[in-house]
Amino acid sequence: VGGSAPTLGDHDVSNSDIGDVSAGAYYRIFPETPTSPDVVWNVRVKAPTGKYPNGIKFRQVPNNTNLSAPDDLPTGNGVWTLSTGLTFVKTIDPAILFANVGYAHNFTRKFSDISSDPANSYGGEVDLGNSYQLGGGLAFALNERMSMSMSYAHRFAQKSRIKKDGESWQSIIGSDSSSGSLNFGVTYAMTDHLSMVTNVG
C-alpha cells in the first residue's frame, strides 16, 4: 500500500471467524391467477454472530506515518437485523415479470467500546440505520433450454448514528446511501438436472 509520501509500507490482517448468521422463511400469500400475480411474503432474521467492527483499534504501521491498519477485521456488523418483503411474479408467455419491495430494520445495540483510537476506549450505542429496497425485472425463454433475464434493484439506506456514554446521538456523515444495480443473466439447461447460470451486473 503506498501513500502520498515517499515512504511505502504494507500490513497484513486476516480473520477467518464466522460471519453473521441469518435464517428466513417464505410464505405464498396469493397464487397466480389469469389476472393477478403470485405474491410471496418473506421474513429474515440476522444474528450478530460475527466479529463486529466497533472497538477495533487502528494503529500506525511501523515506518509509515501515513498508514494506519486495524488490529482485526470484522466479519459482521454487530447488530440484530429483521427484514421483510413482498415478491410479485406474473407469467405473460413467453416472459415472466417480477417485482419486489423490502425493508430491513437494524436494532440499536450498546457496546462496551466503540472507539477506533488505541489510546482511548469508551462505550456507547450504535444505530446503523434502516434500509428500503425495491426492484423488478423480467425473464423470458429463448428456446427450450436457454432463458435470459434482466433486473434492476435500488436500495436506500438511512444514516447511521452513534451515542457515546453520557452524550447525545450523532449522525455519521456519509453513512446514508442510495445505490442501484442493473443485472443481465443467461441460464442454459445442460441436462434435465444441471444448469449453467451466468450473470453480469
Q: Where does each model-flagged region fall?
A:
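Hydrophobic, aromatic-enriched interface-forming segments
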Residues: 76-114
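Residues on the lipid-exposed face of transmembrane beta-strands in outer-membrane beta-barrel proteins
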Residues: 23-27, 43, 84-90, 101-103, ...
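A subset of solvent-exposed loop/turn segments in beta-rich extracellular surface proteins, enriched
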Residues: 1-22, 31-34, 47-67, 113-121, ...
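Short loop/turn motifs that connect adjacent beta-strands in outer-membrane beta-barrel proteins
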Residues: 30-39, 52-54, 94-95, 145, ...
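Residue-level detector of the transmembrane beta-barrel scaffold of outer-membrane proteins
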Residues: 1, 24, 38-42, 96-100, ...
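Outer membrane beta-barrel transmembrane domains
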Residues: 110-201
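Transmembrane beta-strands of outer-membrane beta-barrel pores
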Residues: 20, 29, 45-51, 90-94, ...
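Residues that define the transmembrane beta-barrel architecture of outer-membrane proteins
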Residues: 16-21, 37, 78-82, 126-132, ...
